[in-house]
Amino acid sequence: MKVILLQDVKKIGKKGDIIEASDGYARNFLFPRKLAQEASDANMHILNNKKENERKQKLAELEAAQKLAEELKGKEIKIKAKTGENGKLFGAITSKDVAELIREQYKIEIDKKKIVMDTIKLAGGYEIDIKLYPEVSTKMKVIIVPQE
């Protein structure tokens, strides 16, 4: 009997897979536990619609991430910070600070988890990586200027 998996099942397959299962296994194990449903024409149609909608949504997210990457590419952020001897900062600049400054200066909302950088503790120029989507990333320049 052909069944559509509704959840990942160890050693059987992943959610959305269409597998061949024995009648007893399907009726006595998979169906009662809501792990699978019969692969009827109606259920296959629903599955295909879900997969198509997911594909369209991922494509839209990818396009939005690429557009955002183009907007941010080559931009820079200047931060004035109090420094001590040798340009060492009092405190540090983190990805949270950079995300807030991007929001303030460019009106673009970016999650701090998407900003890949080490904590900045010295004045100077730094290049940070922003991973907007698994295959879309961009670079920005952060300049730390000592406060007078």
Curated annotation (Swiss-Prot):
GO CC field: ribonucleoprotein complex; ribosome
Gene transcribed to yield this protein: rplI
Function of the molecule: Binds to the 23S rRNA.
PANTHER family given in the database record: 50S RIBOSOMAL PROTEIN L9
Keywords: Ribonucleoprotein, Ribosomal protein, RNA-binding, rRNA-binding
Sample GO molecular function, one term: structural constituent of ribosome
Origin: domain of life: Bacteria
Protein name: Large ribosomal subunit protein bL9
Similarity section: Belongs to the bacterial ribosomal protein bL9 family.
GO biological process terms held by the UniProt record: translation
UniProt cross-references to SUPFAM superfamilies, sorted A to Z: L9 N-domain-like, Ribosomal protein L9 C-domain
HAMAP family for this protein: Ribosomal_bL9
Pfam families from the UniProt entry: Ribosomal_L9_C, Ribosomal_L9_N
